[in-house]
Design a protein with these regions (language model features):
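Structural motif
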Residues: 95-104
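Short, hydrophobic/amphipathic alpha-helical patches that form generic packing surfaces
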Residues: 104-116
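Short conserved catalytic/interaction loops centered on acidic-Pro-aromatic/His motifs
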Residues: 119-128
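Generic N-terminal initiation segments characterized by hydrophobic and/or small/turn-forming residues
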Residues: 3, 99, 112-114, 131
């Protein structure tokens, strides 16, 4: 069995969500009230407890989707880690892609849940994006190298 570990720093994840929310706040603001959406969408330090809950939901949704591969999950204070146990036929070259998609999935899922509270019109777009990343992760994990004849 091949073992890989997917990790994301909560502070890095929350920074990405904050940047995305701020960007959406600026872009969605009406011309006559430029700060209204920005103030409503901005992530502040007081939102950490909510973001912790949303990021835990994201990790647990991932685990549910790929449960046949999951060896362990750690919802730590600073880092979320999902340990996977994969078939020996798993192509290790895909690990970089899986890791990148994991980080993107976590950010998209938390952003979607954040937007559900602050800008519901954009939530489904971000949830669809998180599902796309989730499907790419599953596709890479379940991809197998074709058998090779030893010569």
């Amino acid at each position: 069995m091949k073992e890989i570990s997917l990790s994301v720093s909560r502070s890095r994840l929350y920074g990405e969500v904050a940047r995305t929310a701020a960007y959406l706040g600026v872009k969605q603001a009406p011309a006559d009230q430029p700060g209204e959406h920005f103030d409503r969408l901005t992530v502040i330090d007081g939102d950490k407890v909510l973001l912790d809950r949303l990021s835990n939901e994201a990790a647990l949704a991932l685990v549910e989707h790929i449960k046949s591969c999951v060896a362990a999950i750690d919802l730590g204070e600073e880092v979320i880690t999902v340990s996977l146990s994969l078939s020996d036929a798993y192509d290790s070259c895909l690990t970089v892609s899986v890791t990148g998609n994991f980080e993107a999935y976590m950010a998209a899922f938390v952003t979607a849940r954040w937007l559900r509270l602050t800008l519901p019109a954009k939530e489904e777009v971000w949830m669809a994006e998180s599902r796309r990343f989730l499907n790419e992760i599953a596709s890479a994990l379940y991809h197998r190298n074709p058998p090779r004849r030893h010569t």
